Amino acid sequence: FGPFTRMDPGPMNYDYRGEQEACEMRLAFGKSGDVEIELIEWVSGGCPHKEFLDAGNEGMHHLRFIVDDLDSKVAEAQSIGYQSIWGTRYAEGLAVAYLEREGDPLILEFFENHHA
């Protein structure tokens, strides 16, 4: 995998379990073919990544799916028991949502990016 591209976007506001929360993370992305690995370093603020670390977990946290219409995919997932727990719309056509469902070990990430 690699090379890795690092992003340090600073604090950003997210809807986190129904509340607005500023969260800061450092990110690095590496690819091999069509597979991408994202390394996330939590820095500050409430988010699912901090929950994961506070619970003593390490390793794979979520699985990302690229979607054309974030809102419709979130609604579809909610219809089968998923709850949206974290997300934001960065700009028109650029948004993210994390979803969880009781009993599922991984969080789902839906990512809409019409700017790529």
Predicted regions and their residues:
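Extended intrinsically disordered, low-complexity coil regions enriched in Ser, Thr, Gly, Ala
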Residues: 1-8, 53-58, 68-90
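A cross-kingdom feature marking solvent-exposed beta-strand/loop segments within repeated
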Residues: 8-22, 45-50, 59-60, 92-95
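Residues embedded in well-ordered beta-strands within globular domains across many folds
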Residues: 5, 64, 111-112
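Short, well-structured hydrophobic secondary-structure segments
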Residues: 3-6, 10-13, 19-38
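Vicinal oxygen chelate
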Residues: 27-35, 52-69, 74-116
